[in-house]
A protein has these predicted regions:
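P-loop NTP-binding core
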Residues: 1-121
Length: 121
């Protein structure tokens, strides 16, 4: 069974990215399948994973927009998930800020519950 952890805090500079990256690395080293999701428009976790947020064509924003548009997010998953240093991750960039505003203005409708069970985190 997959375990889902969210590392959150509304304050910046408290170690969310560092904690997430190090926890992911430790779990990967222990043989666990790890999927990290960068949910920050600044793309700090994406940078830690050695990707340039500005150069990425497919990111978390594509996946979230697909869900909001009721299209198939599966079309973007294989393109958005990147493998780096033995860890899979979904990158983020400034396009995620636009998704945030869409979420705020969206009707209160339940989103479909889809989950890929290949990952431990």
């Amino acid at each position: 069974m997959a375990i889902i952890l969210a590392i959150t805090n509304s304050k910046g500079g408290v170690g969310k990215t560092t904690t997430c990256a190090n926890l992911g690395a430790a779990l990967s080293a222990a043989g666990k399948a790890v999927l990290l999701v960068d949910n920050d428009p600044q793309g700090d976790l994406t940078k830690v994973m050695r990707s340039d947020p500005k150069s990425l064509k497919y990111t978390l924003a594509n996946l979230m927009n697909a869900v909001l548009d009721d299209t198939e997010p599966e079309l973007f998953v294989n393109r958005a998930v990147i493998e780096g240093a033995g860890i899979h991750y979904i990158p983020a960039n400034s396009k995620l800020a636009g998704v945030s505003s869409r979420l705020v203005s969206a009707n209160e409708q339940p989103l479909p519950r889809r989950r890929d069970r290949r990952y431990s985190l």
